[in-house]
A protein has these predicted regions:
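Positively charged N-terminal leader segments that act as targeting/secretion signals
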Residues: 6-26
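Auxiliary alpha/beta "docking" domains used to position bulky ligands
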Residues: 31-176
Length: 176
């Protein structure tokens, strides 16, 4: 299992220790676990709620529906314009073999409910509470990547938080 220690400690145990970041002193890798198992443990230790893995194979089945959406004017304007880049992950990173998809849960209940009044009140969506989710997720991706770099050689990555070329929902579905 992965353990992150805030204070430097030394133990006699079946772990490898690596410096990880200023916030945490050590990244602890359990001998005998697969790289995937170590990555999952790391993800959970830095606050990633869900993590999935999939191949960097093409999403060719999306091509027809993506082109139709453009023709019918059903795009929101936030989608990446190049459909080829949306369905071929290796156009974003030619060395890609695996795509890691993460999810972080939002707080969904107020710690203290507002008092009922005669006046109507609006509600804000939970994903607008606190920091912009783009920054939160990018930070988690960067921390995950730093940990993976400590575990493996020749690691190359490109992080995307719904601003990249790939279709996020398709990646997440295939990654489980």
């Amino acid at each position: 299992m992965f353990l992150l220690y805030k204070k430097k400690k030394v133990f006699e145990s079946p772990f490898y220790y690596f410096p990880l970041s200023p916030e945490t002193s050590f990244l602890c890798i359990m001998k005998g676990m697969t790289l995937k198992e170590n990555i999952i443990q790391l993800a959970h230790s830095i606050g990633i709620s869900k993590i999935g893995f999939t191949t960097a194979d093409d999403f060719a089945y999306l091509e027809k529906s993506l082109r139709l959406a453009v023709e019918e004017g059903r795009n929101s304007g936030f989608e990446h314009k190049n459909i080829e880049e949306r369905i071929h992950p290796k156009l974003s990173l030619s060395s890609a073999k695996t795509i890691i998809s993460i999810a972080v849960a939002y707080p969904h209940k107020l710690k203290q409910q507002p008092q009922k009044t005669a006046y109507k009140r609006g509600k804000f969506t939970p994903n607008s509470w606190g920091l912009d989710y783009h920054y939160v997720l990018q930070d988690k991706l960067n921390r995950l990547a730093a940990g993976i770099e400590e575990m493996t050689r020749d690691f190359e990555y490109k992080g995307m938080v719904d601003t990249g070329a790939l279709v996020d929902t398709a990646v997440a579905q295939r990654a489980g």
